[in-house]
Amino acid sequence: MIQVLLVIICLAVFPYQVSSIILESGNINNYEVVYPQKVTALPKGAIQQLEQKYEDAMQYQFKVKGEPVVLHLEKNKDFFPEDYSETHYSPDDREITTNPPVEDHCYYYGHIQNDADSTASISACNGLKGYFTLRGVTYLIEPLKIPESEAHAIYKYENVEKEDEDPKKCEFRRAGTECRPARSECDVAEYCTGQSAECPTDVFHSNGKPCLNNFGYCYNGNCPIMYHQCYALFGPNATVGQDGCFEWNKKGESYFYCRKENDVPIPCAPEDIKCGRLFCELIKNTCKYDYSEDPDYGMVDHGTKCGDGKVCINRHCVDVTTAY
């Protein structure tokens, strides 16, 4: 309790020193402060190699909503391919390619103890940053940059897009007083009318309005883009898969399809392949995907941009001008 109070004081008094991404963005107010405690994960009698900075397996304990959880992590040994190389250019435009050792990296996958359906994708380079699922709920975790503190912020992924679900009561405040701020550029702030104690009905910009510098189109008050969806599934190191990955959705089998009819997977038409299974990239030139018994899990979200002037509606990539 004292630690939580100190963090609150730091946030109030030293806002520029506590400069985590979520605080800098100002989009997340509803988060929980936790202090992950590392627990040895080495088998009894095992010896950690001295030259190895990042262990092959780690465990962390912390609480989520007052409930103790144990996060099991294993180094993702497939994160880098065997022929991994880095290329950069010198000041005189010479191409320089190196093959740095990548065995001792800091990228992990894992799960929550006693939750068979849980998953986790974590970067442990500087604190714990990434995501984990607990009882079907996706949480993001990242360190709060407070000097000499192990404080981390945990918040639900849904809160990234739903900053303020509980609007302030107007209580007959002066007309024009903001009672519900816009949660994204696709949302509209609501203001007290001066005639009612209730905040007006939540409204948002029209579906199909360009957002995030034309990377997406507004859909029901949000701006769904594939990059954010990959972040939620696989953590901060994920990006959108290459176009060739989405060709798999034309198979119409296993996990690669656009929709199901009577539990039979229906292949995507060539123009709809980016409205089926979502493909992300963690390792260069690889196709990463996820799935579950939930038919919508791991699929491209409705309203997502699937091409210039096109959005995904009912698993079809259609013209945004006629979609809504």
Curated annotation (Swiss-Prot):
Unfolds at 47 degrees Celsius in pure water, but structurally more stable in various buffers up to 60 degrees Celsius. Residues 21-173 form a propeptide. N-glycosylated. Exists in at least six differently N-glycosylated forms. The glycans likely have a stabilizing purpose. Coiled coil: none annotated. A motif (D/ECD-tripeptide) lies at residues 185-187. Residues 1-20 form the signal peptide. The keyword Calcium applies. Keywords: Calcium, Cell adhesion impairing toxin, Disulfide bond, Glycoprotein, Hemostasis impairing toxin, Metal-binding, Platelet aggregation inhibiting toxin, Secreted, Signal, Toxin. Pfam families: ADAM_CR (PF08516), Disintegrin (PF00200), Pep_M12B_propep (PF01562). Residues 179-192 are annotated as: Inhibits platelet aggregation. Expressed by the venom gland (at protein level). Expressed by the venom gland. Structurally relatively unstable in pure water, but more stable in various buffers between pH 5-9. Most stable in 20 mM HEPES buffer at pH 7 with the addition of 2 mM Ca(2+). Potentially useful in the development of antithrombotic drugs, particularly due to the possible control of its activity via the redox potential. Disulfide bonds join 179-199, 186-218, 192-199, 211-223, 230-280, 245-287, 258-268, 275-312, 306-317. It comes from the Eukaryota. Ca(2+) binds at residues 187, 190, 202-203. Its main location: secreted. One of its GO terms (molecular function) is metal ion binding. Arises from a gene lacking the catalytic metalloproteinase (MP) domain and the N-terminal part of the disintegrin-like (D) domain. The latter results in truncated D domain (D'). Belongs to the venom metalloproteinase (M12B) family. P-III subfamily. P-IIIe sub-subfamily. PANTHER family: ADAM A DISINTEGRIN AND METALLOPROTEASE DOMAIN, DISINTEGRIN AND METALLOPROTEINASE DOMAIN-CONTAINING PROTEIN 28. Abolishes platelet aggregation induced by collagen, ADP (IC(50)=292 nM) and arachidonic-acid. The inhibition of collagen-induced platelet aggregation may be due to its ability to bind collagen and block the binding site on collagen for platelets and/or to its ability to bind to the platelet alpha-2/beta-1 collagen receptor (ITGA2/ITGB1) to block its interaction with collagen and hence prevent platelet stimulation. Monomer. Is able to form a homodimer. This is Disintegrin-like/cysteine-rich protein MPIII-3. It comes from Vipera ammodytes ammodytes (Western sand viper).
